[in-house]
Every structure is written in C-alpha cells, then in structure tokens.
Design a protein with these regions (language model features):
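Core nucleotide-handling region used for phosphoryl-transfer chemistry
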Residues: 1-182
Length: 182
C-alpha cells in the first residue's frame, strides 16, 4: 500500500476529497484506502474469523469463504472518509462458495459476537417497518439492509434508507445523489 499512497493522495487532492468515494456498485480493496492502519483493522476480524472457520466442520467444507465489511469512521459519509477519523471494519456478509451468502439467522448466530451490522428488527417485512426506517425510528446512520431466507439461492436482500440520509445525499451530490441511494 505504500506504493499506492502518493497516487491516491494526488487523486484525492485533485478531487478535493479526504478519501476515495465508494458506492453501492463499487467494491474497494482495503489497500486502496491508503493511510489507515490496515493491519490493526484486519487483525481485529482476521483472528476470530480464522478460529470460527477452522473450528467449524461446516465452514471447513467450503471451497472459499469471502467476508464483506464496511470501512467507516464516525465522520464517514457515502464512501468518503476523514483522514484523522478513527476507522473500523464492520462485518455484514459472509459468502461461502459454492453455497452462496449466508442467511441472516446463521450470520447472527455465527458472527454476531464480532463487530458486525446491528440487528434492529426481526419479523415480517412490512410497509410500517419501512416507514419506521424512513423516519429513523431505529436511529441508524443511513438506514437498513433487510435480509431473509436460509441463505444461498434462497437469500433475498433489500435496502431501506432514511429520509434524513436522502436529504444529506441531495445536498452533497445534487443530481448524482441517486448513485448513493437504495
């Protein structure tokens, strides 16, 4: 990552940003985040994940396991990060090949003790729940990702963002705000 830093700083300076933007369509490798303490962040999850994957007969049977995390700090917004802000990794999905992405119950059971996405609701996905999310009843920074099914081909997901997050996106990105929306 040391070789990437000068190039990233130049690109960030030209864009007037503290960090590279990410969107719902963009996966970014941690090395692309430049000056953050990557080893510490990765090790916070790597050691307990390795233990789970090695000790569980279920996980040892998979060909490949990929984890998906959100990289963020208290001042992060829409994939932009403040350099001085302390960052963390939050686990939100595990892909076990060839099965697919784990279902929500298995994810919470196996990984809920790690820094992971907070469960705000369990139950049927209803219009009333969606409206509660939009009005920020659950006090989230952006909104929620709803998941259901057992996992793999049976898994479904959908995002619901808060009205206040939508307003922040419109202020920050004008006509491109929908690139960062649900």
């Amino acid at each position: 990552s040391d070789l990437l830093r000068p190039q990233l700083r130049d690109r960030q300076a030209r864009a007037g940003q503290d960090a590279l933007p990410g969107t719902r369509h963009t996966l970014r490798h941690l090395a692309a985040t430049a000056d953050h303490d990557l080893c510490t962040l990765c090790n916070q999850l790597a050691q307990p994940l390795h233990k789970i994957f090695m000790e569980s007969e279920t996980y040892r049977a998979y060909q490949t396991i990929k984890i998906f995390t959100e990289f963020l700090g208290a001042e992060s917004f829409a994939g932009l990060h403040k350099q001085a802000d302390a960052k963390k990794l939050i686990l939100f999905d595990v892909l076990a090949e060839p099965f697919g992405i784990l279902g929500p119950e298995q994810f919470v059971r196996d990984f809920g003790h790690l820094p992971s996405a907070r469960v705000v609701y369990r139950g049927k996905l209803t219009g009333a729940f969606a409206e509660d999310v939009r009005k920020n009843k659950y006090k989230t920074a952006e909104g929620v990702v709803c998941k259901g099914g057992k996992g793999g081909a049976d898994l479904w997901m959908m995002k619901i963002k808060t009205d206040s997050y939508m307003q922040k996106l419109k202020q920050a990105f004008a006509d491109k705000w929908e690139d960062y929306w649900e």
